[in-house]
Amino acid sequence: MNKFKNIAVYGGGSFGTSLASLAAQNCNNVTLFLRDEAIAKEILHNKTNVKYLGDIKLPAHLQATTNLDIIKDFELIIIAVPSYAFDDSIKLLKTHSISKDNTLLIATKGFARNPTTLFSDRLKTLLPHSPTAFFVGPNLAKELAKNLPASASIASLDIDIANKIAYNLSSKIFTTNVSSDIVTLQVAGALKNIFAIKSGIDLARKQGENARATLIVAALKEIAILSKALGGMQKNSDILLEGVVGDLVLTCYSLGSRNTKFGYELGISSDKKQFLQEYKELVEGREALKLVLDLIKKYNLHMPIISEVASCVIPYVIPAKAGMTYESTQQCLRRNDI
């Protein structure tokens, strides 16, 4: 199978930088595209991105630039921007002549906005001719950058594209599998951050490890509910992909996850209203909640865990409850139609 002769990563945060480091393990021509000139120079000269990854050393041959004029020359372009910036990022890349000659690998997790939809649906409008795949896996950015063992799922409607990307990213310590179910991977990648918020709250409320493990099972059911509504889950085995159950477990169990950390700090907060008003760090699950509620309403779905997290995090949308309970998890587990 052919290798990509060069790989670009668009997005210079912790995840984008770690993906560039991962890609550079198998490719000698990898460039990280970012907006911050100072960070680009730091990566070029010091091989670090201290702001996002501390003192972790990046591969010696990894390049960095702010010059988007050359991104069209890269065969594989990995998109690793926050979900709120996805549309604007794709539109910007389009102005720099991205075409069918560029394969896109979407590593952003969440939903496109205005209207709420899957990234794959938005790309049909913005870049309909570019080959596209999706990257989802149990990947903490710092561990990826340290070259520790990990895995991911690569999904594309064109399984040959998925296989080629998997071949280019796989190594002795990084395992990939491929799937054609782009819907389930996108849904799981967005919802897992919301479930991680509940996991953090459960941890703060000392609900116990049994409850947190049970949450994983219930969360998988809610992922299946939304995925089926959007046309995914043609095979029940799709739920077992690394990018679904693996990413969910990691995000819900690690305090290295921003979403679990946010849920935990919300849970121990004495003034939750003030906490929510003053919390400035980006929490993707918090961003995704309102968008998921749009989809729940549109498709008339019953997803009690999502609704309960929303009542705690955005109480002006759903009336606030006294506190997070085990009830929503039980409601989901009682369903046998999934």
From Swiss-Prot:
- What keywords are assigned to this protein? Cytoplasm, Lipid biosynthesis, Lipid metabolism, NAD, NADP, Nucleotide-binding, Oxidoreductase, Phospholipid biosynthesis, Phospholipid metabolism
Enzyme active site: 192 (proton acceptor)
Instruction: Specify which residues bind NADPH according to the UniProt entry for this protein.
Output: 14-15, 35, 109, 141, 258, 282, 284
- Signal sequence coordinates: none
Q: In which pathway does it act?
A: Membrane lipid metabolism; glycerophospholipid metabolism
Primary place of residence?
Answer: cytoplasm
- What functional role does this protein have? Catalyzes the reduction of the glycolytic intermediate dihydroxyacetone phosphate (DHAP) to sn-glycerol 3-phosphate (G3P), the key precursor for phospholipid synthesis.
Protein name (record) = Glycerol-3-phosphate dehydrogenase [NAD(P)+]
What species does this protein belong to?
A: Rickettsia rickettsii (strain Sheila Smith)
Gene (UniProt): gpsA
